[in-house]
From Swiss-Prot:
Region described as Disordered: spans on this chain: 113-193
Record lineage: Eukaryota, Metazoa, Chordata, Craniata, Vertebrata
Designated name of the protein: Zinc finger CCHC domain-containing protein 17
Domain of life: Eukaryota
Intracellular or extracellular location(s): Nucleus, Nucleolus
Gene symbol of the encoding locus: ZCCHC17
Alphabetized Gene3D superfamilies for the sequence: Nucleic acid-binding proteins, Zinc finger, CCHC-type
Ranges of Basic residues composition bias in the record: 134-150, 178-193
The protein's assembly and partners: May interact with PNN. May associate with the 60 S ribosomal subunit.
Length: 193
């Protein structure tokens, strides 16, 4: 009818109007003949066929075929090995067939929906107790020790400095400048290494 999509055919053609059409297809369905007609490939003024070799019609058919739904077709891997790779730690291939580069991104196969459901069910029955990272615990303990050491050394020196019991945060500007210099030196050393 038109080269672009038409929502209301009544905008272009009214019932009873005479139009030029081209027969583009004929099918038998349930003892009936289905006839496909096209107004696009015929000049409506003269009735001349604009697509005598049916090139435009074939292109449209190809476009329609490409939009078919392929969700029912599942990609299946035929031979998945029941092994674990020594290089990357992923299942399904040997180390000699592994393409992973050292320090590269690791990829593994996505489990089927059925396997995910089974894993979810087993996870509901068995809820493991979360274990904390031991390195985090060590870091926290070291931090607490340093904090305690600072408090004890500060409290010793602050008793002699102030009579009210409160310790002074910054005793002098000279010590503050010295700390900044030390920090800068440490910072520079880190970048050089």
């Amino acid at each position: 009818m038109s080269s672009c999509r038409v929502d209301k055919p009544s905008e272009i053609v009214d019932v009873g109007d005479k139009v030029w059409v081209k027969l583009i297809g004929r099918e038998m369905k349930n003892d009936r003949i289905k006839v496909s007609l096209s107004m696009k490939v015929v000049n409506q003024g003269t009735g001349k066929d604009l697509d005598p070799n049916n090139v435009i019609i074939e292109q449209e058919e190809r476009r329609r075929r490409s939009f078919q739904d392929y969700t029912g077709q599942k990609i299946t891997l035929e031979a998945v090995l029941n092994t674990t790779c020594k290089k990357c730690g992923c299942k399904g291939h040997f180390a000699k067939d592994c393409f992973m580069q050292p320090g590269g991104t690791k990829y593994s196969l996505i489990p089927d929906e059925e396997e995910e459901k089974e894993e979810a069910k087993s996870a509901e029955f068995e809820k493991p107790v979360p274990t904390r990272n031991p390195s985090r615990k060590r870091k926290k303990e070291k931090k607490k020790k340093k904090h305690r050491d600072r408090k004890s050394s500060d409290s010793d020196s602050s008793d002699s400095e102030s009579d009210t019991g409160k310790r002074a945060r910054h005793t002098s500007k000279d010590s503050k400048a010295a700390k900044k210099k030390k920090k800068k030196k440490k910072h520079k050393k880190k970048h050089k290494e």
